[in-house]
Design a protein with these regions (language model features):
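Short, compositionally biased leader-like segments
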Residues: 1-15, 318, 324
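Flexible glycine/proline-enriched surface loops and loop-helix/loop-strand junctions
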Residues: 62, 148-155, 166-170, 258-267
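Active-site Gly/Thr loop motif
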Residues: 217-275, 304-357, 393-397, 402
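Short, well-ordered beta-strand elements
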Residues: 44-48, 352-353, 359-368
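Active-site helix/loop module of the DD-peptidase/beta-lactamase fold
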Residues: 63, 68-72, 86-128, 146-147, ...
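Short, conserved catalytic-motif segment at the N-terminal edge
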Residues: 6-69, 91
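Alpha-helical scaffold elements that line and support the substrate/ligand-binding pocket
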Residues: 42-43, 68-89, 116, 161-191, ...
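Short, gly/Ser/Thr-rich active-site loops of penicillin-recognizing serine hydrolases
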Residues: 266, 287-290, 303-311, 372-418
């Protein structure tokens, strides 16, 4: 007999379908523990959590349960650079070496911040493996990064910088911040604290382990079986030992359930927090970023549709669209109501994004890893339910994933306990 998963939280009136799909994720789609949150027009309209925080046992996923979100961290890291740009500390079109002279080694002198954040720099590999011990020494990590040679001529193509992007963003922040804070500290001080977020890039040691969800990772057998969900080109890259995709993971191998790994800063992949926190952060962006000191000029830069001359991703083997550190909508990754949407997915199924035209901030997190490159059925069911609810509040402007919509007008929404 299957035990029904506990579900708790709140939804606004009109958003009950999100709760229904959340329940179906446990009953039909295999979720173990998860949470979903959405803010619309600056107000919380969905905040649900449920299931178990560990794959085995009966410890419940509670309101304050946090989980590592893998590459969904990249979007939060990119927000820190947007704040730096708004403050005049960072020019996206300047060479990285202007701020970090040592970066210019081995053919990298002309690489701009934009090229790096757009995954065009060719810095997808690490010639030296970074252990947890080395990751604690950021100066040592910086020397490794500075010595790296690009895998292709920078600016001529693009490819997903799986684990390295966050490490390079770390060094940019450390060099442009007048206080030389780490990216994790900068995020905490300038984004998390002002917004009241429980999200960390570098987990504090005083966070009790009982608050952390444990990931159910893929075994080798399940991993091979799960490849049927990925595009054939990506599958080929994953099973080819010498591919850039396979090699991109070799420089930084860590167990996402290892507390030591969570306590160092890996801004491309080890952020820990709640869906509520990420949805709130993206809501601030969806509202224009004023809460974070984002200027209209920076907001326009960050939300401008990406210019991708060659959509094929050299690492993934399929088209991808990135701009200034964020994933953007494309033919094979459709989210948001217009090309201005921005966010970041994470390995296993987590996803968070901002939709400025709909004024929506959204996030989904879970502890059971699946292997969809995009549109994990669990997450997409929730996302679609959110947009259906928004459309019902404004029937004459129904949402279409592939069609831009105008900003939605204010609607009175009362929050009801469920």
């Amino acid at each position: 007999m299957t035990t029904r998963a506990h579900i708790d939280g709140v939804v606004a009136s009109g958003f009950n379908d999100v709760r229904t799909e959340f329940e179906r994720n446990f009953a039909e789609r295999g979720d173990i523990g998860a949470a979903v949150a959405a803010y619309w027009r600056g107000e919380k309209v969905v905040d649900l959590w449920g299931g178990r925080r560990t794959p085995e046992g009966d410890q419940p996923w509670n309101k304050d349960t946090m989980v590592v979100v893998n590459s969904t961290t990249k979007g939060l890291a990119a927000m820190t650079l947007a704040v730096a740009n708004a403050r005049g500390w960072l020019d996206y079109d300047a060479p990285v070496a202007r701020y970090w002279p040592e970066f210019a080694q081995n053919g990298k002198a002309a690489i701009t911040v934009r090229q790096l954040l757009d995954h065009e720099a060719g810095l997808v590999l690490l010639d030296e493996k970074l252990t947890i011990e080395k990751l604690r020494d950021l100066d040592a990590v910086a020397r490794v990064l500075a010595r790296q040679t690009p895998a292709w001529t920078p600016g001529t193509r693009h490819g997903y910088h799986t684990m390295t992007l966050g490490l390079y963003m770390q060094e940019i922040v450390r060099h442009v911040d007048p206080a030389h804070r780490t990216l994790g500290r900068f995020f905490h001080d300038e984004i998390a604290t002002p917004l009241g977020l429980e999200f960390y890039i570098g987990l504090p040691r005083d966070i009790p382990g009982e608050r952390l969800a444990t990931l159910k990772t893929l075994s080798a057998a399940r991993g091979l079986l799960a490849l049927r969900y990925t595009p054939p080109a990506v599958t080929l890259k994953m099973i080819t030992p010498g591919s850039l995709l396979r090699r991109s993971f070799a420089g930084l191998a860590a167990d996402p359930n290892d507390r030591r790994y969570l306590e160092v800063e890996v801004p491309a992949g080890n952020g820990v927090g709640t869906a509520r926190a990420m949805a709130r952060a993206y809501s601030a962006f969806a509202e224009g970023g004023a809460e974070l000191g984002i200027t209209p000029e920076t907001f326009a830069r960050v939300t401008a549709p990406p210019e991708v001359a060659r959509p094929r991703d050299e690492v993934l083997g399929v088209p991808s669209y990135f701009s200034l550190g964020f994933l953007r909508p494309g033919p094979n990754v459709s989210f948001g109501s217009s090309p201005r949407a921005l966010g970041a997915p994470g390995a296993g199924g987590s996803f968070a994004f901002a939709d400025p035209d709909a004024r929506l901030g959204y996030a989904y997190v879970m502890n059971k890893l699946d292997f969809y490159l995009e549109d994990d059925p669990r997450e997409k069911a929730l996302r679609d339910a959110v947009y259906r609810a928004i459309a019902r509040h404004r029937p004459e402007r129904r949402h279409s994933i592939s069609q831009s919509t105008a900003p939605l007008r204010s609607a009175g929404i009362s929050v009801a306990r469920t």
